[in-house]
Amino acid sequence: MIIVCDTRQQAGKHDLKERYFAEQGIATVRSKLIVGDYTRLDNQTVAIDTKKDVLELAGNICGGQHERFRNECTLAQKCGIRLVVLVEEEPPHGDVGLWQAPKTKQGKLLSQVKGGVLKKAMATMTERYGVEFEFTTREQSPARIVELLEEIGR
């Protein structure tokens, strides 16, 4: 299997994944993807869009990035691509509805989005566009990417 990594991924922020892929003998190439951050070179029917944490997800779904994110979900749906959003942070007790935005050192919330609102918005995105959401740890993320891409064609 050869994994395609989107060229718009920030350099140096994904070394853990790249190292894991190399250790597993999985080749990678960089190319601009129409949706997501990772897919297979030989079968692009699944794309994985990674988010570093729930705060980034909240910004994409309920914040200033909503239109761009929605457009990406719509494009995936139109192209018959299964889009999996892999969030590299596990919410409290496995329930994003319990999530609370982190605070700055001054005690100000980094986002006004509440966990319950985010959970409902995620359900709406799944219902309308078929996008799937999964939560994992940063350390387990590379293995989960490989698992999801290996499922293609089974």
Regions of interest found by a model, annotated:
Residues M1-N43, E56-R154:
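Non-catalytic C-terminal interaction segments of nucleic acid-processing enzymes
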Residues V46-K52:
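Conserved catalytic cores of phosphodiester-cleaving nucleases, focusing on short active-site segments
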